[in-house]
Swiss-Prot record:
GO terms for molecular function: cobalt-precorrin-6B C5-methyltransferase activity; protein methyltransferase activity. This is Probable cobalt-precorrin-6B C(15)-methyltransferase (decarboxylating). Keywords: Cobalamin biosynthesis, Methyltransferase, S-adenosyl-L-methionine, Transferase. The keyword Transferase applies. It holds the Pfam family Methyltransf_31. CDD domains: AdoMet_MTases. The lineage of its organism: Archaea, Thermoproteota, Thermoprotei, Sulfolobales, Sulfolobaceae. InterPro entries: CbiT (IPR023475), Cbl_synth_MTase_CbiT (IPR014008), Cobalamin_biosynth_MTase (IPR050714), Methyltranfer_dom (IPR025714), SAM-dependent_MTases_sf (IPR029063). Its EC number is 2.1.1.196. It comes from Saccharolobus islandicus (strain Y.N.15.51 / Yellowstone #2). It catalyses: Co-precorrin-6B + S-adenosyl-L-methionine = Co-precorrin-7 + S-adenosyl-L-homocysteine + CO2.
């Protein structure tokens, strides 16, 4: 499938899905990718790649001169990300690794320009610490979180490690749903997008 636009936000229904595998929804994904500030040729790491929606869109943004690494502890997620990458024709500049963060991150022999941390890992502090070791100077880290505890732990860890220009954005999305008498707005769970830079 070809995504012919130069902006992120591929509709969710364009991706192959699995009910057991989480997906970063299109509006949140578009905001998270904008916070990453991806450039052509960047090296990107997607920790907790899930369905591969962020991996695929990041790959489209970095182009053929960049590379995106997708990491997930679930084999089903790795396989689903692979299928979605094939569907969008970007598998050639994606590397998929099965393993659990933060441990698996130290086996990757690369430094990254941008790191996206999706989902709600209990090891968020350790993952942020590992990210500091493998991100280039001037690199950006963006985290999506649902739980307030994850937000608190992430901000605390980022401040203590030395990330600068920290931002937190709370996003509440409501989508229209047709009913018998009109359109009702259905609110999704609030998502927090946390970002920071390594100086």
């Amino acid at each position: 499938m070809e995504w012919k636009y130069v902006i992120p936000g591929i509709p969710d229904n364009f991706f192959e899905r699995d009910e057991e595998i989480p997906m970063t929804k299109e509006e949140i994904r578009a905001l998270a990718l904008s916070k990453l500030r991806i450039r052509k040729g960047d090296m990107i790491l997607d920790i907790g790649c899930g369905t591969g929606s962020v991996t695929v869109e990041a790959s489209l943004l970095v182009g053929s001169t960049g590379k995106v690494y997708g990491v997930d502890k679930e084999e089903k997620a790795i396989n689903l990300t692979r299928r979605n990458a094939e569907k969008f024709g970007v598998l050639n500049n994606i590397v998929l690794i099965k393993g659990e963060a933060p441990e698996i991150l130290f086996t990757i022999n690369e430094k990254f320009d941008r790191i996206f941390i999706g989902g709600g890992s209990e090891k968020i502090k350790e993952i942020i610490s590992a990210s500091w070791e493998i991100i280039k100077k001037g690199g950006r880290v963006v985290i999506d979180a649902i739980l307030l505890e994850t937000v608190n732990n992430a901000i605390s860890a980022m401040e203590n490690i030395g990330f600068i220009n920290l931002e937190i954005t709370e996003v509440i999305i409501a989508k229209g749903m047709k009913t018998k008498v009109g359109t009702a707005m259905m609110t999704r769970n609030p998502i927090f997008i946390i970002s920071g830079e390594k100086q």
